[in-house]
Amino acid sequence: MSMLSLHQLQLNIEKRNLFDLCITFLPSAITYIKGANGSGKSSLLRMIAGIMQPSSGNIYYKNSHINNCQKPYCTYIGHNLGIKLEMTVFENLKFWSEIYNSTETVQAAIHYFKLDYLLDKKCYNLSSGIQKVVAIARLIVCKSDLWLLDEVETNLSKENRDLLNNLIIMKANSGGIILLSSHQESVIKSAQILQLK
């Protein structure tokens, strides 16, 4: 089963314990991570993605410690969008599809987010909102059942926010686990809230 478990996961900064978490996320879970600035929302997502080490504790996905999971085991989109600005929109999507061995999904991502007219554009020529759309199109391109999304709705138009929310619901309905940090109110009624102090 594709469970995600945090076992006594702690983050200590300047002798302050930001969180101490013991929690399991089951398949089809959508969880909004809430908390004030500096409460550790982004750090928690980075830990689960394997980018940052916790102060103590362990993270397990599909019953394996994340250090032993075959990479890439998740799709993480943070403040650094992970797009290559000197490459075109199509080249970026193709690049990610090759990492995840999922080249057949590129056209689906292009169609879903209506990117056809931008395929040959270099990403440095795009607005911050469209760069964000290219980044979240990876959610279709990259075949993973664990999505970690750090304030991805920022700079998105209402249309693209709606497309993103529908995509999240579809992923959850197919058994995926989605964790999102957000300053906005949850518009997904089935979502649960993880509140960091």
From Swiss-Prot:
<keyword id="KW-0813">Transport</keyword>
<dbReference type="Pfam" id="PF00005">
    <property type="entry name" value="ABC_tran"/>
</dbReference>
<keyword id="KW-1003">Cell membrane</keyword>
<dbReference type="GO" id="GO:0005886">
    <property type="term" value="C:plasma membrane"/>
</dbReference>
<comment type="subunit">
    <text>The complex is composed of two ATP-binding proteins (CcmA) and two transmembrane proteins (CcmB).</text>
</comment>
<keyword id="KW-0201">Cytochrome c-type biogenesis</keyword>
<dbReference type="InterPro" id="IPR005895">
    <property type="entry name" value="ABC_transptr_haem_export_CcmA"/>
</dbReference>
<dbReference type="GO" id="GO:0015439">
    <property type="term" value="F:ABC-type heme transporter activity"/>
</dbReference>
<dbReference type="GO" id="GO:0005524">
    <property type="term" value="F:ATP binding"/>
</dbReference>
<dbReference type="GO" id="GO:0017004">
    <property type="term" value="P:cytochrome complex assembly"/>
</dbReference>
<dbReference type="GO" id="GO:0016887">
    <property type="term" value="F:ATP hydrolysis activity"/>
</dbReference>
<keyword id="KW-0997">Cell inner membrane</keyword>
<dbReference type="InterPro" id="IPR003439">
    <property type="entry name" value="ABC_transporter-like_ATP-bd"/>
</dbReference>
<keyword id="KW-0472">Membrane</keyword>
<feature type="domain" description="ABC transporter">
    <location>
        <begin position="1"/>
        <end position="196"/>
    </location>
</feature>
<keyword id="KW-0067">ATP-binding</keyword>
<protein>
    <recommendedName>
        <fullName>Cytochrome c biogenesis ATP-binding export protein CcmA</fullName>
        <ecNumber>7.6.2.5</ecNumber>
    </recommendedName>
</protein>
<keyword id="KW-0547">Nucleotide-binding</keyword>
<comment type="function">
    <text>Part of the ABC transporter complex CcmAB involved in the biogenesis of c-type cytochromes; once thought to export heme, this seems not to be the case, but its exact role is uncertain. Responsible for energy coupling to the transport system.</text>
</comment>
<dbReference type="InterPro" id="IPR027417">
    <property type="entry name" value="P-loop_NTPase"/>
</dbReference>
<feature type="binding site">
    <location>
        <begin position="35"/>
        <end position="42"/>
    </location>
    <ligand>
        <name>ATP</name>
    </ligand>
</feature>
<keyword id="KW-1278">Translocase</keyword>
<comment type="similarity">
    <text>Belongs to the ABC transporter superfamily. CcmA exporter (TC 3.A.1.107) family.</text>
</comment>
